Amino acid sequence: MLSALARPAGAALRRSFSTSXQNNAKVAVLGASGGIGQPLSLLLKNSPLVSRLTLYDIAHTPGVAADLSHIETRATVKGYLGPEQLPDCLKGCDVVVIPAGVPRKPGMTRDDLFNTNATIVATLTAACAQHCPDAMICIISNPVNSTIPITAEVFKKHGVYNPNKIFGVTTLDIVRANAFVAELKGLDPARVSVPVIGGHAGKTIIPLISQCTPKVDFPQDQLSTLTGRIQEAGTEVVKAKAGAGSATLSMAYAGARFVFSLVDAMNGKEGVVECSFVKSQETDCPYFSTPLLLGKKGIEKNLGIGKISPFEEKMIAEAIPELKASIKKGEEFVKNMK
């Protein structure tokens, strides 16, 4: 069922660069001047699916917008600077993508970003709840395992919560899993599709290699190494950049892939499947990432975990306590906000 619905990785991204698909999606990027925000905005500007791109940040957005506006694609671009301009940036938006926040430095976990990024996400999502309550909200800001519960609680406070429209963007985990499996097996990565479930940090990232399309087999030691590499791939990039940032280019690609899939589904395209960290009843965790069938109104159907191996079952059991703690931390943050 799942593999039949899942299209090859990156198909939405490639299609968005072709001229056949036409649409009028109005997309906002909050945190558009940052390391992820700039390349993400470039990919969105390059897509015929997007008709209006509004960019928000606390610095440099007029420059980023001016630069992007010279590109010969149809999306109009406008930059907005500072909190007083945020409402105008959000009005009429169909999709809001939030990569805002501080990046990881060597030695930091995603959870170390909590104190700074929790406040940023709570502030930005409160503005979304007020000025574009019906938009699809895509959260990239880490720690996603906590920032999605924060977003949900903020929307509840404003009385506009719709769990089918709030997404934690975990797509980079899938993109990495596809790339690493393809590398090991000598396959074309565009033809590999590995569902990744759970959360978006360390051992909560659970690649379901047993469900990979095409089917692949690894000896247990190689499977354990591959799984560990997928889980710690973000740290691999942080270390390689030696203090100069975290994964920005691959994250921008993954964020764009998710947005294009979402817009495709909103346009009525059928069979669009992406994994995302969302409100869930698949486990006893209130939020969990699984493959989702996307539709015109967001999540059309949660496709669940499916058939998994004992190794994957064990990973889920080990991930759940950490996931629950991160979720609770996010929920408590909003409850304690003044």
Curated annotation (Swiss-Prot):
GO terms for molecular function: L-malate dehydrogenase (NAD+) activity; protein homodimerization activity; protein-folding chaperone binding. Substrate binds at residues 104, 110, 142, 176. Enzyme activity is enhanced by acetylation. Residues 1-24 form a transit peptide. It is an enzyme of class 1 (oxidoreductase). Its EC number is 1.1.1.37. The modification Phosphoserine is found at residues 246, 326. GO terms for cellular component: cytoplasm; mitochondrial matrix; mitochondrion. It catalyses: (S)-malate + NAD(+) = oxaloacetate + NADH + H(+). Its main location: mitochondrion. Keywords: Acetylation, Glycoprotein, Mitochondrion, NAD, Oxidoreductase, Phosphoprotein, Transit peptide, Tricarboxylic acid cycle. The active site is at residue 200. The modification N6-malonyllysine is found at residues 239, 307, 329. One of its GO terms (biological process) is aerobic respiration. Pfam families: Ldh_1_C (PF02866), Ldh_1_N (PF00056). Acetylation is enhanced after treatment either with trichostin A (TCA) or with nicotinamide (NAM) with the appearance of tri- and tetraacetylations. Glucose also increases acetylation. Glycans are attached at residue 33. NAD(+) binds at residues 31-37, 57, 117, 140-142, 251. It is found in: Mitochondrion matrix. InterPro entries: L-lactate/malate_DH (IPR001557), Lactate/malate_DH_C (IPR022383), Lactate/malate_DH_N (IPR001236), Lactate_DH/Glyco_Ohase_4_C (IPR015955), Malate_DH_AS (IPR001252), Malate_DH_type1 (IPR010097), NAD(P)-bd_dom_sf (IPR036291). The modification N6-acetyllysine is found at residues 78, 91, 165, 185, 215, 239, 296, 301, 307, 314, 324, 328-329, 335. NCBIfam families: MDH_euk_gproteo. Belongs to the LDH/MDH superfamily. MDH type 1 family. This is Malate dehydrogenase, mitochondrial. The gene is MDH2.
